[in-house]
Amino acid sequence: MTAKSKFRGSFTALVTPFKNGGLDEAAFRGLVSWQIAEGTHGLVPVGTTGESPTVTHDEHKQLVEWCVDEAKARVPVIAGAGSNSTAEAIGLAKHAEKVGAAAVLVVTPYYNKPTQEGLYQHFKAVNDAIGIPIIIYNIPGRSVVDMSTDTMKRLFELKNISGVKDATANIARVSAQRAAMGEDFNQLSGEDITALGYMAHGGHGCISVTSNVAPRLCSEFQTACLKGDYATALKIQDKLVPLHTNLFIEANPAPVKYALSLLGKMSNTLRLPMVELSEANREIVRQSMVHAGLLN
């Protein structure tokens, strides 16, 4: 992958399966292979949905290695490599590059609330340390800071900054970022429910939670959007809206892990402080899967 590579389509923000207190390698590899077979365009391990805050650094690196190995270059792997410590982010990014990831996803530093200049210097330091594309992960709802379009424009002048995973849920940002950086700046939605509007405004794809359980539908949806076939995309969206909504009925990834357990893909196990989906909401998620045609 060149630094300004194009990333297009449906990218799955992979969950992390656990078993007996550790990682479930077989379930994780099985999920990766199934995703590719179902048409997913790319894979994103150890992000928010992958419970990155509660895996150890060694586990984080192991998950990236397994994902790259199982993908076998059939689709790009955009490895989660974020931290609120610049040194840690650089270490994770270097490891991802070393083991063959196509790119890294680097979240805006959380909790310590850097200024826009601090954000610039953080991403510049990661940029200067590696030679593969970097996708900025802008998620102010979790990190508390919102990277401005002006800061993104400055960063896009660097050789490895390739685009953004936009989890602001502000569709107007797509047009503003497109005007500032042009069509070569990869714009990937981080919000399943608004992805249709995001694509219509000029987006290039989605890093999706829903595609964990509905990879084929999400792939077909993105393919239709990229072709400009919004009539087909809308029909698929109608199937997916209950899932898009109810996979966030409680904190992610509890609902999506429960959904995957219904498909027999893995156990419904999370690490504290995340807990399993409550009994009260399980039938709601199941009915959303029925609506999408994933269960009878």
UniProtKB/Swiss-Prot annotation:
Keywords: Amino-acid biosynthesis, Cytoplasm, Diaminopimelate biosynthesis, Lyase, Lysine biosynthesis, Schiff base
Binding-site residues for pyruvate, renumbered to this chain: 49, 207
Molecular function via GO: 4-hydroxy-tetrahydrodipicolinate synthase activity
Described purpose of this protein according to its UniProt entry: Catalyzes the condensation of (S)-aspartate-beta-semialdehyde [(S)-ASA] and pyruvate to 4-hydroxy-tetrahydrodipicolinate (HTPA).
Species for this entry: Afipia carboxidovorans (strain ATCC 49405 / DSM 1227 / KCTC 32145 / OM5) (Oligotropha carboxidovorans)
Annotated GO CC locations: cytosol
Cited Pfam families: DHDPS
Stated name of the protein: 4-hydroxy-tetrahydrodipicolinate synthase
HAMAP family from the UniProt entry: DapA
Site feature (Part of a proton relay during catalysis) residues: 48, 111
SUPFAM superfamilies the UniProt entry points to: Aldolase
